Amino acid sequence: MKSLNIYRNKFKDFGVSHKSLQWKSKGAAHQRFRQFWAEIDFDNKNVLDVGCGFGELGNFLTKRYKYVTYKGVDIMPEFIENGKKIYPSLDLEVADYFNHPKGELYDTIICSGALNSNLGTEKENRLFRENAIETMFLHTTNLLAFNMSGGHPSLKNSKENNIYYSDSLEILKYCMTLTRRVIFRQNYHPSDFTIFMYNVREK
């Protein structure tokens, strides 16, 4: 699996670092986190963090919200192993969630940074992202929130770059085939966007 190999190679080079997660800096990661805080009240919510890395977002959540129930999953065993050492109170688990989701439903699912890897062709990248979004959305009873590298018009992609820049409007159009209740934000970073998808049953 190409995304797993990308992260594994990064971890070999950088160890427990934001660079292993393909973030330019901790500040860049926190900037994305703040988009979630601005929209979501996590109190009394059952939250799944897909692609949790070392669990830093979970640490923020459980400190900020007294009554949140948090679970983090990541495809990388090395991330989870080290995350449990850094944040022993967090519920962290190794899982290939996009391909093998479990049956549990969550009030809120969040995904920060796990939809950025360059998997090859434009079609391969598009299908990976659409499958991941649909899988997560089908397992939330209320809200899916995710961020992704890209914008509109999208930045130029290259095979040599581990990051793939998606066309944000194409991603938004796909999300709206699953629900019309969406919030789209692209005002906080020139090459990143966040989408909130509400799982509201139409009457």
Where are these regions (language model features)?
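Conserved alpha-helix/loop element of class I SAM-dependent methyltransferases that forms part
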Residues: G27-D43
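N-terminal, positively charged/glycine-rich alpha-helical extensions of SAM-dependent methyltransferases
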Residues: M1-S17
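Conserved class I S-adenosyl-L-methionine
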Residues: N44-G53
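Conserved SAM-binding loop of SAM-dependent methyltransferases across substrates and taxa
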Residues: F54-Y65
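Conserved SAM-binding strand-loop segment of SAM-dependent methyltransferases
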Residues: P88-F98
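Conserved beta-strand signature within the Rossmann-like core of class I S-adenosyl-L-methionine
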Residues: T140-M148
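Conserved SAM-binding loop
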Residues: G83-K84
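Conserved SAM/SAH-binding beta-strand->alpha-helix loop
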Residues: M76
